[in-house]
């Protein structure tokens, strides 16, 4: 039951897929490609396919079909086999010459029954049967044009993208984000004849939209498979309203009943809503190199958790252009290179300064092993120094091949260190520290007035100034760290000034970024009127007020702000830190905010008896394994903090951190202001 179970779980799943792909054309969707990328790498898949041709394709409507000499196809899909997915499958197969089709879905058959509205009682009677998959197998043969051809449909739980032995992400759920009070109003308006929900505290599985509920069930199915792989029976806990729905669904997941009876090990699974603390998600206090890399470098296309590393310095190409396209980028994930993987894990677990020195050490050692003419230099590590070491490998193909993974991480580091965004990181940090002091000494209106002069139109901005998206990051920081607001005349006036300034800036942008296009619902600033811009900004501030009140339903974790005194400056105390400290509190108090989710009648009876008998309820520190799942994304610094904290508070306890995505500050405005949280796109 080691923490590296997240890696073996993923690799075991991929081995089942690889057993099917020999000489096949393989179609992957983005989330499965990301799981492969972090789990075992595309090279492993290509080796399993064999043959000289590259038969790897993206699963999309315009995907190229299989030619006359390509009789076999394998589709690896992270979604329900329904609606648009089935239509794309049909179209690809109909324009191909396949005689053998395998479809692998990461969603279990039980969830397919739920999606097809099969009642729970009827589904329970079908144990061992897979009618949905069997019907699709018939359809596949029909589309191939011969009922005697071969079709297979089966489930493999490829839920995770393992970033480190103790840390994994769920790419298929990257847009899953906890609800806000404004979503409660939307839920109420969609069910006018039912009891009105008063707050997020009233939200449960019976009140959510069918799409969101089904998305949660898909996640729960994958988590149940993970617990089965780890050999544990889980006790589920939650902090936050959406986390409660997910935890309750996992605790009562019917297909897991038999597994739980026979499991030898035990584990606590604690879900936490990201919205309860967005300060940590948008803040720049994390002294971590990887956080800076994922913020500075462009995203790897189709991925949510990796970046493009420009490899041109290792080629004979020369370009003076600033914005040329990177044809064959490097990346951070080095799943099949043990040395690079060791460096990557060191970067995740060390502070910025040590991490940069570690990169230099690895480059120097690699160059020495290859007998390259290295000039040693001590002192501060500079991007130029790293580049000079990397350039040594340029004309030595063998050395390049031997250390390709390491060179990608080295280039990522050098490119980040000299990136203008990294210099700005320190500006953010300084302003955030200033804000923390101001919040303790002044009213919110004064803090907003401090921000006002920083809101500048594009014609007046220098590289030092904040872009509209960066201003949104600062606003989220301010509202999240402040917490519940006292709404008075001064606050309303200060907010109105900031709103007008922001709306004007949006109108005057030379071109709207993809995020601003989503926020304003307009694709060009030329046609964006001040009136329309102001309506969009008003909606932003509704979300900001919601974020300020996000912890209002909590009793214990009400604040992430620690006021200053004579000896200490004001500071931010992460909610995750408070939760982990509470879990491992030596006196094991019954936490009011970490809610235990009972699984069925037995637990309810226990809870009932406990009112007049001494029945101990499960506590999250009871078991040797803690799985902490942050719903809505997590930062590298937070993962390190949790790992270090558990090791110091209860040595010997294993911890696995899971989350929907790896966060950089700019992800939060997207998830908060430009994502339909209630209606995820399931493709039907």
UniProtKB/Swiss-Prot annotation:
InterPro entries: Sec1-like, Sec1-like_dom2, Sec1-like_sf. Pfam families: Sec1. The keyword Transcription does not apply. SUPFAM superfamilies: Sec1/munc18-like (SM) proteins. One of its GO terms (biological process) is vesicle-mediated transport. Keywords: Protein transport, Transport. Gene3D superfamilies: 1.25.40.60, 3.40.50.1910. Belongs to the STXBP/unc-18/SEC1 family. May be involved in protein transport. This is Sec1 family domain-containing protein 2. It comes from Homo sapiens (Human). The gene is SCFD2.
């Amino acid at each position: 039951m080691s923490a590296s179970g997240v890696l073996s779980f993923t690799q075991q799943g991929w081995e089942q897929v690889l057993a099917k792909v020999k000489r096949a054309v393989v179609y992957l969707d983005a989330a499965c490609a990301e799981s492969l990328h972090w789990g075992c790498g595309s090279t492993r898949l290509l080796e399993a396919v064999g043959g000289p041709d590259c038969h790897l394709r993206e699963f999309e409507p315009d995907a190229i079909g299989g030619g006359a000499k390509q009789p076999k196809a394998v589709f690896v899909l992270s979604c329900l086999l329904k609606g648009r997915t089935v239509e794309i499958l049909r179209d690809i197969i109909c324009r191909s010459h396949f005689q053998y089709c395998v479809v692998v879905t990461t969603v279990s058959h039980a969830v397919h029954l739920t999606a097809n509205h099969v009642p729970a009682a009827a589904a329970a009677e079908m144990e061992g049967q897979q009618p949905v998959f069997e019907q699709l197998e018939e359809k596949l043969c029909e589309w191939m044009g011969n009922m005697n051809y071969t079709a297979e449909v089966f489930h493999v739980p490829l839920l995770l993208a393992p970033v480190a032995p103790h840390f994994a992400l769920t790419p298929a759920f990257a847009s899953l984000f906890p609800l806000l009070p404004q979503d409660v109003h939307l839920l109420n308006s969609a069910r006018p004849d039912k009891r009105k929900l008063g707050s997020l505290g009233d939200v449960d599985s019976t009140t959510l939209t069918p799409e969101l509920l089904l998305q949660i069930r898909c996640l729960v199915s994958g988590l149940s498979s993970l617990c089965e792989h780890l050999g544990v029976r889980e006790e589920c806990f939650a902090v936050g309203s959406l986390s409660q729905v997910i935890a309750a669904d996992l605790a009562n997941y019917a297909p897991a009943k038999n597994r739980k009876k026979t499991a030898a090990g035990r584990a606590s699974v604690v879900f936490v809503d990201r919205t309860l603390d967005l300060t940590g998600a948008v803040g720049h206090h994390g002294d971590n190199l990887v956080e800076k890399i994922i913020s500075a470098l462009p995203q790897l296309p189709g991925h949510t958790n990796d970046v493009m590393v420009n490899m041109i310095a290792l080629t004979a190409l020369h370009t003076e252009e600033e914005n040329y396209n990177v044809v064959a980028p490097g990346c951070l994930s080095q799943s099949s290179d043990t040395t690079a993987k060791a460096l990557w894990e060191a970067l995740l677990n060390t502070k910025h300064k040590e991490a940069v020195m570690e990169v230099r050490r690895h480059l120097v050692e690699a160059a020495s092993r290859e007998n390259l003419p290295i000039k040693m230099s001590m002192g501060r590590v500079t991007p130029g120094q790293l580049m000079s070491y990397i350039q040594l490998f340029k004309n030595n193909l063998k050395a390049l091949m031997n250390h390709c993974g390491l060179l990608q991480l080295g280039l990522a580091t050098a490119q980040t260190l000299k990136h203008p965004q990294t210099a700005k990181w320190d500006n953010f940090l300084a302003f955030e520290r200033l804000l923390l002091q101001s919040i303790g000494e002044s009213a919110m209106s004064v803090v907003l007035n401090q921000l006002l002069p920083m809101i500048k139109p594009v014609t007046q901005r220098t590289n030092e100034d904040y872009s509209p998206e960066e201003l949104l990051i600062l606003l989220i920081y301010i509202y999240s760290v402040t917490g519940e607001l006292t709404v008075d005349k001064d606050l309303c006036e200060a907010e109105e000034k900031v709103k007008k300034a922001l709306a004007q800036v949006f109108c005057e942008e030379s071109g709207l970024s993809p995020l601003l296009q989503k926020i304003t619902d307009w694709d060009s600033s030329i046609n964006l009127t001040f009136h329309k811009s102001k309506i969009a900004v008003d909606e932003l501030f509704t979300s900001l007020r919601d974020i300020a009140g996000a912890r209002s339903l909590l009793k214990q974790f009400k604040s992430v702000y620690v006021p200053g005194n004579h000896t200490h400056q004001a500071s931010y105390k992460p909610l995750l830190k408070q939760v982990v400290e509470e879990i491992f509190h030596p006196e094991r108090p019954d936490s009011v905010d970490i809610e235990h989710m009972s699984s069925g009648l037995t637990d309810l009876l226990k809870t009932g008896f406990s009112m007049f008998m001494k029945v101990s309820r499960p506590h999250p520190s009871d078991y040797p394994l803690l799985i902490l799942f942050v719903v809505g994304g997590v930062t590298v610094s937070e993962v390190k903090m949790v790992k270090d904290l558990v090791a110091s508070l209860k040595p010997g306890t294993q911890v696995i951190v899971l989350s929907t995505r790896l966060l950089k500050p700019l992800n939060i405005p997207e998830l908060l202001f430009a994502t339909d949280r209630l209606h995820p796109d399931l493709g039907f």
